[in-house]
Amino acid sequence: MTSLLGLAVRLLLFQPALMVFWASQVRQNCRNGSYEISVLMMDNSAYKEPMQNLREAVEEGLDIVRKRLREADLNVTVNATFIYSDGLIHKSGDCRSSTCEGLDLLREITRDHKMGCALMGPSCTYSTFQMYLDTELNYPMISAGSYGLSCDYKETLTRILPPARKLMYFLVDFWKVNNASFKPFSWNSSYVYKNGSEPEDCFWYLNALEAGVSYFSEVLNFKDVLRRSEQFQEILTGHNRKSNVIVMCGTPESFYDVKGDLQVAEDTVVILVDLFSNHYFEENTTAPEYMDNVLVLTLPSEQSTSNTSVAERFSSGRSDFSLAYLEGTLLFGHMLQTFLENGENVTGPKFARAFRNLTFQGFAGPVTLDDSGDIDNIMSLLYVSLDTRKYKVLMKYDTHKNKTIPVAENPNFIWKNHKLPNDVPGLGPQILMIAVFTLTGILVVLLLIALLVLRKYRRDHALRQKKWSHIPSENIFPLETNETNHISLKIDDDRRRDTIQRVRQCKYDKKKVILKDLKHSDGNFSEKQKIDLNKLLQSDYYNLTKFYGTVKLDTRIFGVVEYCERGSLREVLNDTISYPDGTFMDWEFKISVLNDIAKGMSYLHSSKIEVHGRLKSTNCVVDSRMVVKITDFGCNSILPPKKDLWTAPEHLRQATISQKGDVYSFAIIAQEIILRKETFYTLSCRDHNEKIFRVENSYGKPFRPDLFLETADEKELEVYLLVKSCWEEDPEKRPDFKKIESTLAKIFGLFHDQKNESYMDTLIRRLQLYSRNLEHLVEERTQLYKAERDRADHLNFMLLPRLVVKSLKEKGIVEPELYEEVTIYFSDIVGFTTICKYSTPMEVVDMLNDIYKSFDQIVDHHDVYKVETIGDAYVVASGLPMRNGNRHAVDISKMALDILSFIGTFELEHLPGLPVWIRIGVHSGPCAAGVVGIKMPRYCLFGDTVNTASRMESTGLPLRIHMSSSTITILKRTDCQFLYEVRGETYLKGRGTETTYWLTGMKDQEYNLPSPPTVENQQRLQTEFSDMIVSALQKRQASGKKSRRPTRVASYKKGFLEYMQLNNSDHDSTYF
């Protein structure tokens, strides 16, 4: 475990260096007329070729490259740098342990500045795949090996030896042949012998055939892997086998080692893959008798030894592996010459991706690379001629054209009648002939009876097909309010808003149903539509929603369909709260969901409906038992399908539907389930319409969503490979839903380590996890609710008195109350209207905000309640809503003194030097209070005391606290010694003449009160206030201060600014 952790740390630390070393190293070793190729010399037992031979092959290739460059008048230097693995820490013993070795060699290249224009090697699949997985290889890599499927379709990888994919395509094509003179039957079964000790090429060839979701496995009805020689011998000689065909990889000697001296059954065919042996074509080669039942797949001799010099140079201890290194060097020289002649840059990404879809002159003749950078060959299938005991060509396979070409007309091999046997034991031409004659006789007898029965059946069936259930509208009932909720833990339900607009939930026959709009107004369906509705009515399966019939409501026709409480699968995937990844949406559940969809589609394809046509995640719904059901099927004649992200490319080009198109839609849904992201999620494209366009108009590599195969483990990789096979561009390569269903069952067994756990056991275990997660979720939501409640209470307490808020929460109403004695405070700003005339709206708002914020801080230090602000008026009361004895007059008086002290030090920001004067009026008396209104409720005061307090303020003087005699009387009853002066008789509108007072301070406390203006100052202010404001504005401009410019609104027009101010005729204190 420690070593694995260390390896992971090394890879993480090393990876950034690999991503950036290309830009610096290539400029040193691939420019200014000097070009190098870096050759990785990894010593392991998988390839028995001495490294010295490989080096000699590369150097010989460089000699040829230099010669060709000179002939092309290109005066450049071409060399090779050989990097050996002698000093590596993770030196491998064979290819299956060389994962770290390739990365270590890359690090050595980076450190020693040896990286050239291209990289030769490694040859091991594991090492090559790991390098592409952990690094960004922005340079061409040429490999003499890397046969595995995991190395397919790499943008910068070129393979000089045939990969496993090419072999697999040949076997599939050969199995399908049924029109050759020597092979009248197509094969659908096979055994694969793989014991794990094969050489590197055989290991990956057989691994591709063994894979459960490979192309070879998909086209076969039966395939089994034999891993022990005893199993191989039993199949080779026994009668209890399921196929006559066995595929293995190796040499004739390795076949004999496994077979021994056992007698092979006459109808057995062994396909021996031995691509790199040349002795089959030698003149002195005689086939042994144990090879009679063997067909050998190899590369023909002209591909590797047609050149006399090649035969001479590679006959002494060398192999096709050495030739591959030489050919790779020639390929590098060919591309270098091409780019230099065209004046193009050999260090850019174009050069890295140019090693494909071309033909160059190799050492043994022309060499062709396909559009994936893999070599194309002509493979030969050989048989043993009983006449000459020589190997002869039976068929040839062109990997470039993907075409099998029969060569032999009447091959004299061991099988009867010069024909290969059937792959199924016991079936052959003779047995088939007997079966045909027997069945013909029976059919003739039954045919006459069937014709009579068929005629009557067709007549009855035609009448029955046109009938369907039309439900009277009286049988459809709306749901109660408490029945419309769906199963979810999400607090908000906005995500279902659009769905509710499209579908209607009702009740039919005591069951919840959904009304699906059929876009039909009169209900006069055509004959074809009636037949489709009848098929819908007859469909009844566990993973399909039930169709009950049609109903006419108002002027529209609806389909009545079974309702599933948890909504669509797309909604479930979006709801990460109700269905978290750690419990419900784990891999087992995802596979169960895929299996439910596959079962439903498998039944649908085998039913009379035959095809869905609109399969997508929004048409897969989940019921209360977490069973996924398919809906919205069978109405293609009524609701034709539309183009969307789930539509197969062939149906985007032509508006049709097919079962293979449903398989493609299943793959898109599977990608949604696996990644739990948006539909057709891909990092390379986010636009919906562009995705559809790129799928419809695929050029080269088809456009598909992301799957992130790099992060998948072995079990998850099986699911990913299944998904990729389902969205193949060629519909014929996609599996059917029966195959998908069986593959998912095998994958589900892998996640349980082959344990026999039923679906109910899995569901119960998942519900237990879900219950524990729900407890934590409820606790978390409770904490969030309490925090939100406290915030709401705090806001309510800022708007209404605390007692009023509690009464509203507990009773829902607030009873109005009469208070015998309270004190009310009024104040306003002198000259407010004149200030507004010379100020912008934002300056007025800022001024009032600065003043009121300071007033509010003062109010918080006294037992008073701020009632409201009206323009420049500020209203405060004490003694309500909580009574406080005689303290109400004391608290209002102290607050008034504090406010007046603050005003003495306050200065307007936008009018520096301008004095701010306020008038304050205070009165005590009885008052009524209560909450008025429903929208924006306010705690309002009513009574003559409120009006009198307002009159006290309006008849007062600037920087003075004007108090009524009732307030002074209350103050005298307290222990507080306030200082006041008698103003004299003052006329109060509505009350007549009363004696009023000026509050000037307290004996035991100092207040920094501003000096009230004299009568002369007041008169001067009335006449010169506008001039003082203009002078303050000029002073602000001279000092360089800028006021904040307000954002103009639509209601602002040219002319003077206007301000809204609440004012009555009696309250004229803001005017002089």
Curated annotation (Swiss-Prot):
Subcellular location(s) per record: Cell membrane; Endoplasmic reticulum membrane
UniProt modification remark: Glycosylation at Asn-75 and/or Asn-79 is required for interaction with VIP36 while glycosylation at Asn-345 and Asn-402 modulates ligand-mediated GC-C activation.
Domain Guanylate cyclase positions: 823-953
Free-text comment about domains: The protein kinase domain is predicted to be catalytically inactive.
Enzyme Commission identifier(s): 4.6.1.2
Extracellular side: 20-433
Cross-referenced InterPro entries: A/G_cyclase, A/G_cyclase_CS, ANF_lig-bd_rcpt, Cyclic_nucleotide_synthase, Kinase-like_dom_sf, Nucleotide_cyclase, Peripla_BP_I, Prot_kinase_dom
PROSITE patterns xref list: GUANYLATE_CYCLASE_1, GUANYLATE_CYCLASE_2, PROTEIN_KINASE_DOM
The keyword Signal appears for this protein: yes
Protein known as: Guanylyl cyclase C
Glycan-linked positions: N32, N75, N79, N179, N188, N195, N284, N307, N345, N402
Residue intervals annotated with topology Cytoplasmic: 455-1072
Source organism per UniProt: Mus musculus
Record's signal peptide: 1-19
